[in-house]
């Protein structure tokens, strides 16, 4: 039985992970749950899974949870704060760490798990894209293992040779028969909109993804397609791929989650219904497979699978992220930071949808930082960029 730590248990990835545990109670035991401030959902999760530890980032939420658990005579120990999260991410007893905290908040806990030599199921792409070389060096310096659980990267992982699977980020793709990686994108809810019409879309419309059930932040990232740009960066790092070895195609049906083209002309693809439980369950059970609880794909009901190139004019954030990766680690850190600020402002109805890309571009182009060589330097760039971004948004509002 594998013992599991779930970082971000009340988010969409965390909920999907716990659903898989419910379906496979003889295979997994939850020992640590971590969330931000949703004490009500955390209480329900503690009641069902009886973890040894529950950690709330928010101190007030932790206090509420502790009282409610005591009232119900549940013995789960409650802690709060970032330090506790990082400590429990490295817990010796844990076999799998699900890294599903959204945004930069997931960086330090993920690195803590890596430095402890844990097996990490990575959904928090920000940890990788802002720390890049630092992240991969930490990974190679100990026994830690990474399994991607983004649907696209997991799809790529599934159809790569076993040797590449076991040596992510360390091997030459062409020497292992791989010609290219084809990264698919749904295009979000606005792929067939004209850019000028996007200024008027609401947060609710932008969060209404046609295929996937996701959290609010990643839903907006999908709508701007910056998420696919970040996934491009993630694929470059995880699979040691060059820019010429990755292609991006919009595939509105979200049935083919990505493909790998081999040097003999073969293309292997991973297909399933758009449900994150498929990717997560594979990573949890690799190299085996278990019941995910997802519905099965019915080919009799598939009428069309379409593919086309993304329009960089319509989705400038996609091109911005691709270009930022080529500029280096500092640029990726800046872009991630300003994007978290602009997405939050859009969700709060402070700026329009198109302002996300405009402000992201302005802040990235007007920022100049030396390449970070430590996590502390990454965090400093992140902090300064957030302050600058907030000032920019405030100047537009008032």
Swiss-Prot record:
SUPFAM superfamilies: 1-deoxy-D-xylulose-5-phosphate reductoisomerase, C-terminal domain, Glyceraldehyde-3-phosphate dehydrogenase-like, C-terminal domain, NAD(P)-binding Rossmann-fold domains. Keywords: Isoprene biosynthesis, Manganese, Metal-binding, NADP, Oxidoreductase. Homodimer. One of its GO terms (molecular function) is 1-deoxy-D-xylulose-5-phosphate reductoisomerase activity. Mn(2+) binds at residues 150, 152, 231. GO terms for biological process: isopentenyl diphosphate biosynthetic process, methylerythritol 4-phosphate pathway involved in terpenoid biosynthetic process. Its EC number is 1.1.1.267. It holds the Pfam family DXP_redisom_C. This is 1-deoxy-D-xylulose 5-phosphate reductoisomerase. It comes from Buchnera aphidicola subsp. Schizaphis graminum (strain Sg). Belongs to the DXR family. NADPH binds at residues 10-13, 37-38, 124, 126, 215. InterPro entries: DXP_reductoisomerase, DXP_reductoisomerase_C, DXP_reductoisomerase_N, DXPR_C, DXPR_C_sf, NAD(P)-bd_dom_sf. It is an enzyme of class 1 (oxidoreductase). The lineage of its organism: Bacteria, Pseudomonadati, Pseudomonadota, Gammaproteobacteria, Enterobacterales. 1-deoxy-D-xylulose 5-phosphate binds at residues 125, 151-152, 186, 209, 222, 227-228, 231. Its cofactor is Mg(2+); Mn(2+). Coiled coil: none annotated.
């Amino acid at each position: 039985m594998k013992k599991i730590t779930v970082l971000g248990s009340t988010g969409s990835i965390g909920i999907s992970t716990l659903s898989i545990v419910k379906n496979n109670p003889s295979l997994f035991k939850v020992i640590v749950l971590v969330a931000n401030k949703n004490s009500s959902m955390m209480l329900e999760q503690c009641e069902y899974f009886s973890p040894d530890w529950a950690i709330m980032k928010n101190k007030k939420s932790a206090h509420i949870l502790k009282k409610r658990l005591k009232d119900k005579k549940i013995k789960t120990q409650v802690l709060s704060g970032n330090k506790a999260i990082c400590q429990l991410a490295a817990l010796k007893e844990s076999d799998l760490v699900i890294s599903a905290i959204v945004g930069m908040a997931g960086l330090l806990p993920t690195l803590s798990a890596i430095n402890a030599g844990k097996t990490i199921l990575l959904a928090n792409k920000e940890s990788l894209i802002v720390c890049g070389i630092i992240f991969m060096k930490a990974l190679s310096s100990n026994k830690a293992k990474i399994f991607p659980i983004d649907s696209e990267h997991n799809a790529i992982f599934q159809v790569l040779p076993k040797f590449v699977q076991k040596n992510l980020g360390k091997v030459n793709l062409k020497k292992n028969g791989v010609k290219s990686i084809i990264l698919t994108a749904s295009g979000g809810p606005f792929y067939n909109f004209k850019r000028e019409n996007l200024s008027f879309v609401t947060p609710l419309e932008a969060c209404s993804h046609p295929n996937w059930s996701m959290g609010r932040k990643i839903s907006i990232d999908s709508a701007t397609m910056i998420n696919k740009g970040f996934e491009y960066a993630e694929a470059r790092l995880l699979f040691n791929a060059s820019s010429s070895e990755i292609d991006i195609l919009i595939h509105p049906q979200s049935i083919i989650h990505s493909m790998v083209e081999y040097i003999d002309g073969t293309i292997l693809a991973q297909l399933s219904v758009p449900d994150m439980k498929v990717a997560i369950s594979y990573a949890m059970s690799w190299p085996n497979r278990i019941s995910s609880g997802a519905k099965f794909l019915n080919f009799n009901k598939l009428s069309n699978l379409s593919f086309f190139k993304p329009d960089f004019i319509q989705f400038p954030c996609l091109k911005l992220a691709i270009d930022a990766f080529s500029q280096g680690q500092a640029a990726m850190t800046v872009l991630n930071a300003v994007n978290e600020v602009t997405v939050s402002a859009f969700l709060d109805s402070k700026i329009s949808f198109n302002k996300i890309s405009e402000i992201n571009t302005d802040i990235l182009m007007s920022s100049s930082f030396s390449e970070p060589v430590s996590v502390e330097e990454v965090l400093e760039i992140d902090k300064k960029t957030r302050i600058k971004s907030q000032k920019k948004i405030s100047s537009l509002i008032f």
